[in-house]
Each structure stands twice: as structure tokens, then as C-alpha cells.
């Protein structure tokens, strides 16, 4: 790609990102209530995404080889414990990820 094409591509990306960030403010203005189905989606999608992350993380574990998925299961237990204790999805995922990385980098080498 030439320099001009790269600049145009970056410009298009910037416009697309800003459009998607500003779109909700135009679709759901402050003076109108948010539709009930949008509130419903805001309530059910975070746990659904959490469930999809769990399935994605555990799909390739091979119980009969290597470490038998022990680091994965321990990290999952940490995530569940933190989530039930603190009720903070970001904290649960971040600490679970750090715990898993520490296990596979330092203990299960």
C-alpha cells in the first residue's frame, strides 16, 4: 500500500469507530426512555458472554496428556470464587487470567 492508501485506510477506520461510538446517543436520546428489550439485553448479555468465555477456555483441554488441565481448572475456580465474592466480572477475569499465566509460566513449566 502506498502512503496515501494507508492514510485513507486509517481515516476510514477512525470514522467507523467514531460512528459506532456515537450511534447509541442518536438512537437512544436522553429525552426518551430506553426500550425494554435493550434493558433486557443489557441484563442478560454479560452473563452470556461470561459463559461463552468459559466454553472457549475449556474446549481444548486434554485430560489424558500433559498437566491434565490443572492450571485451567484452578484458574476457573479462582474466577468463580472471586466472582461470587466480589460480584465484579472485570476483577474476576483479570485476576483469573493473571493467576493462570503465573501457573503456566512459573509452576507448570
From Swiss-Prot:
Signal sequence region: none
Subcellular localization: Cell membrane
Topology in membrane: Multi-pass membrane protein
Keyword Cell membrane (UniProt): yes
Keyword DNA-binding in record: no
Alphabetized UniProt keyword annotations: Cell membrane, Membrane, Transmembrane, Transmembrane helix
Family the UniProt entry places it in: Belongs to the AzlD/HI_1737/HP1330 family.
The protein's name: Uncharacterized protein HI_1737
Organism: Haemophilus influenzae (strain ATCC 51907 / DSM 11121 / KW20 / Rd)
Amino acid at each position: 500500500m502506498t502512503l496515501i492508501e494507508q492514510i485513507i485506510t486509517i481515516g476510514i477506520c477512525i470514522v467507523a469507530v467514531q460512528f459506532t461510538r456515537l450511534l447509541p446517543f442518536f438512537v437512544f436520546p436522553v429525552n426518551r426512555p430506553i426500550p425494554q428489550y435493550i434493558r433486557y439485553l443489557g441484563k442478560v448479555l454479560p452473563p452470556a458472554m461470561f459463559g461463552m468465555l468459559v466454553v472457549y477456555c475449556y474446549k481444548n483441554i486434554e485430560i489424558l496428556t500433559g498437566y491434565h488441565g490443572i492450571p485451567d481448572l484452578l484458574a476457573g475456580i479462582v474466577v468463580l470464587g472471586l466472582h461470587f465474592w466480589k460480584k465484579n466480572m472485570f476483577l474476576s477475569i483479570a485476576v483469573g487470567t493473571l493467576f493462570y499465566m503465573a501457573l503456566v509460566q512459573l509452576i507448570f513449566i
